[in-house]
Amino acid sequence: MQINENKGFPTEIPIIVEDELFLYPFMITPLFLSDEENLKALELAIQGETPILVVPTKPQQDGARDFDGIYDAGVIGTIMRRVPLPDGRVKVLFQGIDKGKILKQSGINPLRGIVDMLHVKRPSQVKTDALIVVLREKVRELSQFNHFFPPDLLKTIEESAEAVRVCDLVSSALRLKKQIAYSFFVEENLEQRLLKLIDYVIEEIEANKLQKEIKNKVHSKIDKTNKEYFLKEQLKQIQAELGADTSREEELEEYRKKLDAKKKFMAEDAYKEIKKQIDKLSRMHPDSADANTLQSYLDWVLEIPFENVAKKKSSIAEVSKHLNADHYSLEKPKERIEEYFALRELLELRGVGEKVNNGAILCFAGPPGVGKTSLANSIAKALKRELVRIALGGLEDVNELRGHRRTYIGAMPGRIVQGLIEAKQMNPVVVLDEIDKVGRSYRGDPTAVLLEILDPEQNNKFRDYYLNFNIDLSKIIFIATANDVSMIPAALRDRMEFIELSSYTPQEKFEIAKKYLLPQELKKHGLKPSDVSISKEALELIISDYTRESGVRNLRRRIADILRKVAKNILTKKNEGKISVTAKNLKEFLEKKVYEIEPADKKDQIGLVNGLAWTSVGGDVLRIEAIRIQGKGSMQITGQLGDVMKESAQIAFSVVKVLIDNKKLKVPMPIVPKFDDDKHKLEASDVYRRYDLHLHVPEGAVPKDGPSAGITMATAIASILTDTKVKHDIAMTGEITLTGRVLPIGGLKEKLIAAHKAGIKTALIPRKNYDRDLVDIPAEVKADMKIIAVDTIDDVLKNALVAKK
């Protein structure tokens, strides 16, 4: 299509917006169109066989497709070819013909405007020729410094007779910023445009001359073959031109002094690596990115306390003293810890201290708040070592432990090395907290690093990626903590020796509150024993009705709640003299009761059985209900139960069916439904064929799972199918097999404590638990409750069902 500047303009034409290119009339340019507005403008131009205007977006307006985000001038041209691409874009070949200016906005989606051509005001031919000569001369001079003007382009500029075209050629080659390119583009006065271009080219020449001069100055001072050194010296020279201070000898000298002071305490490879990095830093300019990274590295590594190792040896007496002073009860864990450190002390006394760490790593396992971290703190105090806690919960990135390579932005040492720096010791006590909650992701498996850290054969040469040298971790005492041992990978479990910390009994919580928590909280709140007292009954009420946990964290919080109110009352003078908190006035200091264990029913019922459950905050009484409805022998199970518990219910149903078939359970025939079309005499087995059972575990919002309710569900089913009451003051726990055997379960201590709180008088437990775990049950529980060992479901039903008269 030919555009005649004397015909058809101004006229309305569609507008394509270009984000990256600044086009000129003489160009044939491929454009890649993907957005809806540009594609619509393209279709409009093709269908109407009209020219099209391509305009650039303004700076920081890439992606804009409205008149506010674009310049009001561009190139008028035609579409030579259109090719759809597989990715949905359209490639067009655009031929620029002339410059155009938007006079008026006439539409959007697509953009359309009334466009007229830009009319050039030309000076006299003599002046134009003179300016063109100067411009060509300056362009030739500039081409000596950069590659903006290849020979073919220079030849075209020299041979072109059209001044406007020469200006466009030079402008397109200079790679101008959009604002500058636009100001040159819309300049209608040819003389002014030539002068602006000449000035710009002269500025570029001067800038390139200065750059070359700096290079020459540097080049004369250094070895031409040392490219890296050349670049750094060049940067120095530039900074010198800007007046920057490059002196840093004092800082480098400080690094060298620190390194020399630590030299005799560190390995040879560590010393060489740090010295190498100091020397490298001395050759860098202080403002370079690499210098900042290297300086950060030296700040880290020279803080590692190579020279500081705690001299205190293991002392069983000190360990025992601190454990007993800081912790009530926990006799078995304390005994095992004392044995562990007795071995260390014996090895040290006999001069084989280097073998001390060749034993298993201690891991304190138990519910939250039972004193796992506190035990580690007591050990650290006894050994006069610093305690470093490293939280592993949710850790997925292996670099968090091993350190980040220095090539990454924000790189730093791993948490182990950071812990040594924090402790200012090379042999602190390091607590690896919540080791059972370590994750894994595409960034690696932290478990593999932990295996190396905890292996006495490997951890004397642990390599942190950030440090880039080996560091000795063998002097560290590692102690792990976990809530659920089963979640720890097998290889890691093999490295550790587990010390179980179970839930505290109410009596233990009372003693802990009286001897530890209350004195500590009084001190923390600025109170004295003469200011406030909490009665025994009030403390017992707080433990039973205001907290439900395995440990004592919430108990500490409730005591703190009381003391804050006491402090307020003292300051507002609401109370004169000593404030006494009793069971009667406890509600004035704490809100309503939060927890309350439902007491056992006071009468025997059919289909209602007390089971026992273990939770993360202790034990609980789990009441299981069963009803029968005339039907076809199916069973429905509700209460948000897991798969294991559902399977236990099915097994229990099958076991009871067998007992009925074998006449070990007597079914009163009057309860068996009769049908009009019965053709055979009713049998006991008809009771489970003609009834549907519904088994329910209350508190349906709480998920429940596990096999330990097996005998409880079997008892409920047997009770409802034989119309026999279950003793109201009995509770039970145990897994049932298809042959009626009772298998052992876990969490017995917590379960029996919960039963004791609920007023249960008799507990049925598996024989193996009776023989193995009864020694761990608190004395007050065993004194108040009859505990019966059962081997089979027959034993369970014999003790649980009320004998019929």
Swiss-Prot record:
CDD domains (UniProt xref): RecA-like_Lon
Gene (UniProt): lon
Family matches, as PANTHER family: LON PROTEASE, LON PROTEASE HOMOLOG, MITOCHONDRIAL
Any one GO MF annotation of this record: ATP binding
Domain Lon N-terminal positions: 13-205
EC numbers for this chain: 3.4.21.53
Active-site residues (renumbered): S708, K751
Subunit annotation: Homohexamer. Organized in a ring with a central cavity.
Induction profile: By heat shock.
Enzyme class: hydrolase
Free-text function comment from the UniProt entry: ATP-dependent serine protease that mediates the selective degradation of mutant and abnormal proteins as well as certain short-lived regulatory proteins. Required for cellular homeostasis and for survival from DNA damage and developmental changes induced by stress. Degrades polypeptides processively to yield small peptide fragments that are 5 to 10 amino acids long. Binds to DNA in a double-stranded, site-specific manner.
Biological process annotations from GO: cellular response to heat; protein quality control for misfolded or incompletely synthesized proteins
Annotated protein name in UniProt: Lon protease
Catalytic activity: Hydrolysis of proteins in presence of ATP
Listed Pfam families: AAA, Lon_C, Lon_lid, LON_substr_bdg
One term under GO cellular component: cytoplasm
Domain of life: Bacteria
Keywords in alphabetical order: ATP-binding, Cytoplasm, Hydrolase, Nucleotide-binding, Protease, Serine protease, Stress response
Family: Belongs to the peptidase S16 family.
Subcellular location, record wording: Cytoplasm
Binding site for ATP: G366, P367, P368, G369, V370, G371, K372, T373
Domain Lon proteolytic: 603-803
